[in-house]
Amino acid sequence: MKMIAFAVPILEGKLEDWKQMILGNMLGENKKATDESREYAGVQERSYLQKMSKGHVCILTWEGNDPLSFWLDLMKIALPEFTDHLADLHGRGIFKEENPESMLAEMVYDSKDEQSEILKKDEKTEMIAIALPILPGKIEVWKTKILDKMLGENKPDTDAVRHAAGVRERSFLQETPDGHMVILTFEGKDPVTGYSQIIQKMPSEFAELVMEVHGFDVNAPHPPMPELVYNSHE
């Protein structure tokens, strides 16, 4: 199964308008039709609401055999009709009618292992998603000191930590008008506990890099997890 991801900021003062327009439609009387459209396309859509240091962000994921085709078809309908409404909620420059694929985050890491035990069990899993902005001027530090190490000689160890925690991690990099953002997804029987185990096993030098690049102190009390506000399979 393939996954695509996309994170959009919600402008200050627009949270209630966003809830009314987006969630009101998707969770209200249109939910059955919305769910069925995703099922017909063979994708599972999830939406998460995350509180940031300033404002909120909505994280969206689509998973299936061909989620990109569904996304492109969806944008052909949504952007011409709702461009102004979306810009009012999320800001200009986020939604690109001329090239919708360029809006999506790029998957840069996947801990999947065909031998992994969590992939062998035919059981219900859950997924969490987290957005981490990259601080201004820190994108190259993130690429060379975090991502390259995760994908290079440390990848077997990086994967093993995820497998031991019982989760599959997929990481995405998204460019936004305000900079870059990393989207992390963790899927498993208990992804919250798995994520906590990964944080606890993080080497001190890596934790320092996370602080430098994201301004996120892994040793401090963690903020509430993003809330799953829509799941087309529920």
Regions found by a protein language model. Give the residues of each.
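An amphipathic, aromatic/His-enriched active-site/gating alpha helix that lines ligand/cofactor pockets
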Residues: 31-44, 63-101, 155-168, 187-224
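Short, low-order "capping/linker" segments at domain edges
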Residues: 96-113, 220-234
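N-terminal secretory/targeting leader peptides
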Residues: 46-50, 56, 169-174, 178-180
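Active-site-flanking beta-strand signature of metal-NTP-handling nucleotidyl enzymes
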Residues: 2-9, 61, 126-133, 185
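Surface-exposed beta-loop interaction hotspot
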Residues: 106-127
